[in-house]
Amino acid sequence: MENFSEWYHNILETAGIYDLRYPLKGCGVYLPYGFKIRRYAFEAIRDMLDESNHDEALFPMLIPEDLLAKEGEHIKGFEEEVYWVTHGGTTPLDVKLALRPTSETPIYHMMKLWIKVHTDLPIKIYQIVNSFRYETKHTRPLIRLREIMTFKEAHTAHSTSEEAEAQVQTALNIYKTFFDRMGVPTIVSQRPEWDKFPGADYTMAFDTIFPDGKTMQIGTVHNLGQHFAKTFELEFETPEGGKDYAYQTCYGISDRIIASIIALHGDEKGLILPPEVAPHQIIIIPLLFKGKEEIAMNKAKEIYKSLKNTYRVKLDDRDIRPGKKFNDWELKGAPIRIELGPRDIENNKLTIYRRDTGEKFQIDEDNLLNELNTLIDSIENTIKEKAEQKVKSFITILDNHDVNNIKETLSTKKGVVLVPYDENIYTEEFEEEIDASVLGTTEYDGKKYISIAKTY
């Protein structure tokens, strides 16, 4: 893919995913097809959180200025990016209201009211909402937005530091599983002190590598210790009758997972969607030969009815040429296409096309369900393997910390450069010298490295 940026912007439009033409920088519109991809992706993470004893909640979008400012270190991290509501109609407000940049302060304000004794803990809640950041950098659709239209944030409170640390590991495992299901390989790093989440003890982050060699952060997990709990007075009575503050964690993902699915699995023909998030997993296209139209259409409807309760299937009965239909669904990344014409029907055969490999082959109609089950699994595995190979090809390991060598490697090979961990060079000054981002410390093949990359 020679020009990834151009390809990416084109595919958002031509595949019907996202419309950039909304008259406000950094804001766009999820089109129906893109919205379905989003829906199925976030249904997966919602199910995983529900299964791990998280409860979904919903907090207000508006945050009073005095509440947002209560945690000074936290707000310093993004105070220049906050949108403010200053009027109600034409009347100036006594207290400005922030449009939710993130929800620690309102959620923890409410947690104070809910937590009294140790038996009130743990609390594990999440919400999937929009959030707002006045991005001053170059905005990119689904990558860097002023209105993040899909922000999944989870917040937990525990009675001991050990429980909070265990929750961090649980969150990391949930995200690892989720990204694997989406076919998105990641590099997990502990962010450096100067780049951790404001107010956190430490931050773990998931990055992936796009086809242009730049990395993008697609998920974070934070151990907050007791920092926010002390600020917001999340105090509880211990089993011994004493007092202690809650230990907290939070973790989030956003629309960037949709951008990653698009970027990592696409090709020059268009999208290649994992079956789990494909709006239509199977497309049925009848080949209508003159005088035999009814035969093919009736069989197509019969197959559609037999599959619709098992798969997300669409019968494309548009009055256009089959070749145009083929191109449309290859562009949109539908995993499987079933073609059938009069001759196929006579021979009890169906022609199958799989988008990920471009293979076309015939199967017996009587064995359709078994073939599809096997095929779905094969497509998911192949998509994952190809993405893993792409990302791995962008990882370079160096045995030294030479600044010029690192710069040259980033320029020629792009991607992520791993250098041996050395606390003496693990500094902001080193980051400035190499003119790239230090992602953090990364375990790779059993060794500890400093990971470095150009980022979005």
Swiss-Prot record:
UniProt keyword annotation of Cytoplasm present: yes
Key words, A-Z: Aminoacyl-tRNA synthetase, ATP-binding, Cytoplasm, Ligase, Nucleotide-binding, Protein biosynthesis
CDD domains: ProRS_core_arch_euk
UniProt KW Transferase keyword: no
EC number: 6.1.1.15
Gene3D superfamilies linked: Anticodon-binding domain, Bira Bifunctional Protein, Domain 2, C-terminal domain of ProRS
Top-level taxon of the source organism: Archaea
GO molecular function, one term: proline-tRNA ligase activity
Database matches in SUPFAM superfamilies: C-terminal domain of ProRS, Class II aaRS ABD-related, Class II aaRS and biotin synthetases
Task performed by this protein: Catalyzes the attachment of proline to tRNA(Pro) in a two-step reaction: proline is first activated by ATP to form Pro-AMP and then transferred to the acceptor end of tRNA(Pro).
NCBIfam families: proS_fam_I
Assembly and oligomerization: Homodimer.
Family indicated by similarity: Belongs to the class-II aminoacyl-tRNA synthetase family. ProS type 3 subfamily.
Domain notes: Consists of three domains: the N-terminal catalytic domain, the anticodon-binding domain and the C-terminal extension.
Protein name in the entry: Proline--tRNA ligase
Biological source species: Methanococcus aeolicus (strain ATCC BAA-1280 / DSM 17508 / OCM 812 / Nankai-3)
Gene symbol of the encoding locus: proS
